[in-house]
Amino acid sequence: MFIPKKTKYKKDFKGRISGNAKGGYTLSFGSHGLKALEPSRLTSKQIESARRSISRTLKRVGKVWIRAFCHTSVSKKPMDVRMGKGKGSVEMWVCKVKPGKILFEIGGVPLNLAREALNKAQAKLPMKCKFVSDEL
């Protein structure tokens, strides 16, 4: 899935997601895209689920670019373990998404098919998103 090959540190701080996206807020590769409207943490499973729904809708037509990648690890302690004794092991990888970030791009597809595919992908994501296009 979407996991970094190598990181400098194994475990990250939780941190906060504040402000708007400083980069990645315009369409770069395709002509249609899905833009985040609120801050959230995307897991690698959610990104993969959205990608699958897009590719099923497009049926081998056009190309899909994924603009979000999971860089942040989330740790969790096992059930029935008392507090203390260090930080838990890495449970999953997430991508911190700020408002305005383009998550997915599609190229070589008609407008109505791209809108349908990205609306299905939006249902798999934990935040509000909107459809953006060069043609509009």
Curated annotation (Swiss-Prot):
InterPro entries: Ribosomal_uL16, Ribosomal_uL16_bact-type, Ribosomal_uL16_CS, Ribosomal_uL16_dom, Ribosomal_uL16_sf. Pfam families: Ribosomal_L16 (PF00252). GO terms for biological process: translation. One of its GO terms (cellular component) is cytosolic large ribosomal subunit. PROSITE patterns: RIBOSOMAL_L16_2 (PS00701). GO terms for molecular function: rRNA binding; structural constituent of ribosome; tRNA binding. Keywords: Ribonucleoprotein, Ribosomal protein, RNA-binding, rRNA-binding, tRNA-binding. It comes from the Bacteria. The keyword Ribosomal protein applies. PANTHER family: 50S/60S RIBOSOMAL PROTEIN L16, LARGE RIBOSOMAL SUBUNIT PROTEIN UL16M. Part of the 50S ribosomal subunit. Belongs to the universal ribosomal protein uL16 family. Binds 23S rRNA and is also seen to make contacts with the A and possibly P site tRNAs. This is Large ribosomal subunit protein uL16. It comes from Ehrlichia chaffeensis (strain ATCC CRL-10679 / Arkansas). The lineage of its organism: Bacteria, Pseudomonadati, Pseudomonadota, Alphaproteobacteria, Rickettsiales.
